[in-house]
């Protein structure tokens, strides 16, 4: 008999902007904060955790096994094991579905899952410095790990922004459509922040400073804008292109976590779950149009669950770019159902801390489902390199 898997204790840090409040707070620190908070929210003891699975993409220079560092810093006993996964933008969500698989297999009852990323602290790399340079360093030999490891398609040698331009060409998506999508994201995120919509899901980050502690408790990436101002932004990746800073996601820092648990263990401990895991899937596409990844992933997850998109009450689809978000909406049949998609804005406004984003959208989905009384929810992301991942949950 297949074990039922539930989610409890979900939380996230606020999302920091590039060069912003969290720029000096490392990935291991951010991860430890959400792990500690998730344990408190779930009402369990740290020693009851069987395993930790956490996503992180930009791991160069962080030291061995970031997930292990996070858990030790969070006070989880050394006897508990941990591993870090890198499925690029899908890492945080895949960590959760991996945890569900382990629990379904009967190999664990309680798993800490999620993701962490500080893109600000990604190092520059000298890949040929091991054996020295005869004279000057060759041009192009200094690699920005943030750009290369997080934002570059290695198969074609170009920025993720070009993959969005490719989708625009394929689908005939206009600059006006992209800007309208970006403006929607900013507007909804601003409304959510102003009304305190995210307060329940956020754990503040306390940053010690010479003039006293800074309590960081609000997403800082959203920007006030107007359609007119967005229309004036120059193309960011291609001459004559239409992808701009206003219709693309940001470079950010954050962490998010959720405790994945067998339903029988939750019942035994008297814990009321936030939701149960219904299905999950991944899918592959051509790397040059990586933003289409949510299409096969979501279709597979829906098919496994015996559902259609009409059965889903709430959707969190990561906004890597407006271009890919529009294409995904068209193909998956929710372009005319946007009232249930990214209802509090998405990554264009909130930000995209790559290793954490999958867990972030899941946390946001779970709390918004509670507020609305929604029954079924879908979280999905595109993944650099040409993939997508998706997870469907049902409120309990």
From Swiss-Prot:
Pathway: Lipid metabolism; butanoate metabolism. It comes from the Bacteria. Pfam families: Thiolase_C, Thiolase_N. The active site is at residues 89, 352, 382. One of its GO terms (biological process) is butyrate metabolic process. Induction: Highly expressed during syntrophic growth with butyrate (at protein level). Seems to be constitutively expressed. This is Acetyl-CoA acetyltransferase. Keywords: Acyltransferase, Cytoplasm, Fatty acid metabolism, Lipid metabolism, Transferase. It is found in: Cytoplasm. The keyword Cytoplasm applies.
